[in-house]
């Protein structure tokens, strides 16, 4: 589910942003709590409300909670042939509060968290690539100066851009 993907993104962010603290704090118990939280939220937002018919809009519904006695034109349900609830009829009237809270909790908030965490991971990766590239260029420059060649300006900018592009492609696939 998206909630599990959200937990994975948060876990990856913690592992990348604080690698030394991650080893101590991310125990098996914490991982189980995070996965349990995702499943609990999924059950609370979908299974229980559907089983208890909380997800249906009470106005004009035929779910047994608040059944209207007549149709809009005054015809009773039985006369209109609606009493048997055949599989051909699809009642899509949702309770507005349920629809909004369900979509927020099970989709929009997790997706927003995933976008934020993967954006931060990308920025951390960019900073690391720049640091590594500058160290590599400094080492190459020092080597070229030691061998008494002309100390040429760095040509590692292209390599740095290639590495950043590779990181962007990798994160976009994830």
Curated annotation (Swiss-Prot):
Q: Which SUPFAM superfamilies does the record match to this protein?
A: Family A G protein-coupled receptor-like
A GO molecular function annotation here is:
dopamine neurotransmitter receptor activity, coupled via Gs
Residues of this chain annotated as glycosylated in UniProt: 95
Bilayer topology reads: Multi-pass membrane protein
Q: Describe the task this protein carries out.
A: Dopamine receptor whose activity is mediated by G proteins which activate adenylyl cyclase.
Q: What are the UniProt keywords, alphabetically?
A: Cell membrane, G-protein coupled receptor, Glycoprotein, Membrane, Receptor, Transducer, Transmembrane, Transmembrane helix
Q: What is this protein called?
A: D(1B) dopamine receptor
- Please report the organism this UniProt entry assigns to the protein: Bos taurus (Bovine)
> Membrane side Extracellular: which residues?
55-96
Per the record, ranges on the Cytoplasmic side are 11-32, 120-169
GO terms in the biological process aspect are: adenylate cyclase-activating adrenergic receptor signaling pathway; G protein-coupled dopamine receptor signaling pathway; positive regulation of MAPK cascade
**What InterPro entries does the record point to?**
GPCR_Rhodpsn, GPCR_Rhodpsn_7TM
Region Disordered: list its residue ranges.
64-88
The highest taxon in the source lineage is Eukaryota
Coiled-coil annotation: which residues?
A: none
Spans through the membrane: 1-10, 33-54, 97-119, 170-174
Keyword set includes Nuclease = no
Localization per Swiss-Prot or TrEMBL: Cell membrane
- Cellular component GO terms, alphabetically? plasma membrane; synapse
Which cysteines are disulphide-bonded? Answer: none
User: Per UniProt, what is the name of the gene that codes for the protein in this document?
Assistant: DRD5
For this chain, the family text in UniProt reads: Belongs to the G-protein coupled receptor 1 family.
